[in-house]
């Protein structure tokens, strides 16, 4: 029997927390007097680090910027963190877990926090659509593969 079949996979959420929150309405109160047809921009970023053997921190940064023309109506940023115990998962599976599975868990918390901040800023309700972190992670892997192939071709041509 192989060792891999004897290894059990284990995943546990230890803690979910808000690491950082920022809300700015730099053009208030003038922005409230304009017709509300904003251009909303959403930026996502994830970072992970190993805190101890098999214990990882994953931080999902969600930044939402709403602009009316050239003026920023509001800028909202939330860093939602989580501490996860992950055992028996390595390599690409671990990267997928940290880069997609954990952010999928964290996103609803970050979304709720952003919705609350925007509401407290007295702006119209903002509902962020669900994000497919699995698809984003697959795009990331594809970009990494293309970059490494491009680097190999450059070396072969030299």
Curated annotation (Swiss-Prot):
What is the name attached to this protein's record?
Answer: Protein-export protein SecB
Pfam families per UniProt:
SecB (PF02556)
**Location of the protein in the cell:** Cytoplasm
Give the Gene Ontology MF terms in alphabetical order: unfolded protein binding
Gene Ontology BP term (one): protein folding
What's this protein's family per the entry?
Belongs to the SecB family.
Q: Which Gene3D superfamilies match?
A: SecB-like (3.10.420.10)
What function does this protein fulfil? One of the proteins required for the normal export of preproteins out of the cell cytoplasm. It is a molecular chaperone that binds to a subset of precursor proteins, maintaining them in a translocation-competent state. It also specifically binds to its receptor SecA.
Please tell me one Gene Ontology term that the record gives under cellular component. Answer: cytoplasm
Q: Which organism is it from?
A: Photorhabdus laumondii subsp. laumondii (strain DSM 15139 / CIP 105565 / TT01) (Photorhabdus luminescens subsp. laumondii)
Complex formation: Homotetramer, a dimer of dimers. One homotetramer interacts with 1 SecA dimer.
CDD domains recorded = Translocase_SecB
Q: Provide this UniProt record's keywords sorted from A to Z.
A: Chaperone, Cytoplasm, Protein transport, Translocation, Transport
Q: What is its main location?
A: cytoplasm
């Amino acid at each position: 029997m192989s060792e891999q079949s004897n290894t059990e996979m284990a995943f546990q959420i230890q803690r979910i927390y808000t690491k950082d929150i920022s809300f700015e309405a730099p053009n208030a109160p003038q922005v409230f007097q304009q017709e509300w047809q904003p251009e909303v921009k959403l930026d996502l970023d994830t970072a992970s680090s190993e805190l101890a053997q098999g214990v990882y921190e994953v931080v999902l940064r969600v930044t939402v910027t709403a602009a009316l023309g050239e003026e920023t109506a509001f800028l909202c940023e939330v860093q939602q963190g989580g501490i996860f115990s992950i055992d028996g998962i390595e390599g690409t599976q671990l990267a997928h877990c940290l880069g997609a599975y954990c952010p999928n868990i964290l996103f609803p918390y970050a979304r709720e926090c952003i919705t609350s901040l925007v509401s407290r800023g007295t702006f119209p309700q903002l509902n962020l659509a669900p994000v497919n972190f699995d698809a984003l992670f697959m795009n990331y892997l594809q970009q990494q593969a293309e970059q490494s192939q491009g680097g190999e071709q450059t070396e072969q041509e030299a």
